[in-house]
Each structure stands twice: as C-alpha cells, then as structure tokens.
Amino acid sequence: MSNIDWDLWLKKPTVTIGQACALSLGIDPDKMTHRDKERDDFQRRLKLLIEIVFFMGNIRVASTNSENIDSEIYLDSFSEWAVNIVHWDTPNELKTLVSGTSET
C-alpha cells in the first residue's frame, strides 16, 4: 500500500474512475504502478465501476472520456456508493466523505 496524501485527495471534488479505484484499495493514484493496475482486485473494481458509471447512473459524473478509466466522477458520490451500496472495504479516510460518517 502506498502512503496516500489524504489531505490532498479528500479536498478534490472529482477524480478519474481509475483514481477512485486506486483510492478505494488504499493505493496512491500518483504512485500507482502498472503492477497495481494488473491486480485482480483493482481490475474487478474498475470493471464494475465503469459499468455503474456508464449504465446505471448511481454515481455523479463530472465528465466522460473515450478512455473510460479517465472519465471524472465526484469523489463524495463514489464514496457513498462504495461504502453504502456495494459495501467495499475502503480506507477509513475515504469513509469520512460519506454522509453521517466521522473520521476515527
């Protein structure tokens, strides 16, 4: 796991789909390696997230890109979905963006 600058990431209103997946796994998107992108858990989350963003509308979208992984979504909307809808195990820092959740 990378040492994530949560102070920076939690202030960003939008992130790319790939960055959101990385953050949800405790990987620093700025330090993500090709090996990180090949991890099964990253690929599973990425595939599901792309489907949800483009076909379900459960996550607010800021902008789309022909490279789906580079489309931008709202981090708070993603966090709400990841924590409360699909119940992913995410870093506590990401959970602080979910309504009614306080940092522990």
Features from the language model and the residues they span:
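Low-complexity, PEST-like segments
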Residues: 1-104
